[in-house]
């Protein structure tokens, strides 16, 4: 018997996740000084995290030999105040929202259960569902309507075997929100768990924030993260908001110390620094407007509307996104080609906000390439 013989067959079907490229990788591969590389590929906060976090981490260094506080009590309290939800309705993940996604699949899915996922969307949903034995039923965001959710494609896939439905809003990579009316229609049509991924909700209009619906409906779980506006992508902190019973079941199987001491302190400090948070929201909206207005000037591109810190862009001159992104990489600009997103043709790339100076330089380089 070989190693291949003892590996689960479902694992062999997967391809390794391809993340956005790092500055270090581009510097090595293209011989470009890391200081000159503009990273606009991973939907990060270009202004970083609160400067107060660095001070808090220095104070925490003397405690790194101790395990973190297992119940995350102080952090739960700060999150509770931030979103207006009781602590008992919050579950924290130490690998970002990915941990919450994986743990909810662990408590829900038996072999043969069904999960509905509209595409194109975040790829981790399907990976977590499949590895736990789920059958994926694909719904769709309609390209002909600027990727508006085709709600009937979701409703028509619901069966007695449906255990969960993933709704990413605002959606990654398309940037648009799902209407509250459509989400309500889906929630009220099934007892399956509706996973509302709000990773980018801080950039959206307030009326699209459905976090409170996790208290209103028993079959709703809302995902949130510290990776975007809070600038803590490197610390991998996410959380879910749902009913107390689901939190209890997830607490039974989640890793005990998955959130490090450094991550706890970082998240607590970030939530307390409201001035920095609000500044990042304002600058993020200004930055995406700068990018949107600049890219709209190129007739060879279709720029889709967004409620996030990134734009989905379609190349209309016949060049595929891999070729286009390779040209940008050689000039020191990282954007994300969308080949890995199920349901998208090979002519799309995603570009996320930079500082205003980075955006300006990116648009200059785009002019050199396109015109």
Swiss-Prot record:
Entry-linked InterPro entries: Aminotransferase_I/II_large (IPR004839), HisP_aminotrans (IPR005861), PyrdxlP-dep_Trfase (IPR015424), PyrdxlP-dep_Trfase_major (IPR015421), PyrdxlP-dep_Trfase_small (IPR015422)
Pathway note: Amino-acid biosynthesis; L-histidine biosynthesis; L-histidine from 5-phospho-alpha-D-ribose 1-diphosphate: step 7/9
First-tier enzyme category under EC: transferase
Domain of life: Archaea
MF terms (GO), sorted A to Z: histidinol-phosphate transaminase activity; pyridoxal phosphate binding
Reaction(s) catalysed by this chain's protein: L-histidinol phosphate + 2-oxoglutarate = 3-(imidazol-4-yl)-2-oxopropyl phosphate + L-glutamate
GO terms of biological process kind: L-histidine biosynthetic process
Transmembrane segments: none
Modified residues (N6-(pyridoxal phosphate)lysine): 228
Cofactor: pyridoxal 5'-phosphate
EC number: 2.6.1.9
Keywords carried by this UniProt record: Amino-acid biosynthesis, Aminotransferase, Histidine biosynthesis, Pyridoxal phosphate, Transferase
Membership in a protein family: Belongs to the class-II pyridoxal-phosphate-dependent aminotransferase family. Histidinol-phosphate aminotransferase subfamily.
Protein name: Histidinol-phosphate aminotransferase
């Amino acid at each position: 018997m070989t190693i291949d013989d003892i590996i689960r067959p479902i694992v062999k079907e997967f391809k390794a996740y391809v993340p956005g490229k790092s500055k270090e990788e581009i510097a090595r591969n293209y011989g470009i000084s890391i200081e000159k590389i503009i990273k606009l590929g991973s939907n990060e906060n270009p202004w970083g995290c609160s400067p107060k976090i660095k001070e808090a981490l220095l104070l925490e260094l003397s405690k790194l030999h101790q395990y973190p506080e297992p119940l995350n009590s102080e952090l739960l309290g700060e999150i509770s105040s931030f979103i207006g939800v009781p602590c008992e309705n919050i579950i924290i993940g130490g690998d970002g929202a990915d941990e919450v996604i994986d743990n909810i699949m662990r408590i829900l899915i038996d072999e043969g259960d069904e999960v509905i996922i509209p595409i194109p969307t975040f790829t981790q949903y399907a990976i977590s569902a499949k590895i736990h034995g789920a059958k994926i039923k694909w719904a769709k965001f309609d390209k002909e309507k600027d990727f508006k959710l085709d709600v009937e494609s979701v409703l028509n896939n619901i069966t007695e075997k449906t255990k969960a439905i993933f709704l990413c809003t605002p959606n990654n990579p398309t940037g648009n929100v799902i209407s509250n009316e459509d989400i309500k229609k889906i929630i009220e049509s099934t007892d399956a768990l509706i996973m509302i991924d709000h990773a980018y909700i801080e950039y959206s209009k307030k009326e699209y924030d459905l976090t409170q619906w996790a208290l209103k409906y028993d079959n709703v779980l809302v995902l949130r993260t510290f990776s975007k506006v809070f600038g803590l992508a490197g610390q991998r902190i996410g959380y879910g908001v749902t009913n107390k019973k689901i939190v209890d079941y997830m607490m039974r199987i989640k890793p005990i110390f998955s959130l490090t001491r450094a991550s706890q302190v970082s998240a607590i400090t970030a939530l307390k620094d409201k001035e920095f948070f609000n500044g990042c929201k304002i600058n993020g909206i200004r930055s995406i407007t700068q990018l949107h207005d600049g890219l709209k000037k190129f007739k060879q591109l279709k720029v889709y509307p967004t409620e996030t810190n990134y734009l989905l862009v379609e190349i209309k001159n016949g060049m595929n996104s891999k070729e286009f992104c390779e040209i940008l990489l050689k000039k020191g600009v990282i954007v994300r080609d969308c080949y890995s997103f199920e349901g998208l043709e090979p002519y799309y790339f995603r570009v996320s906000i930079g500082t205003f100076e980075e955006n300006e330089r990116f648009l200059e380089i785009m002019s050199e390439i396109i015109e």
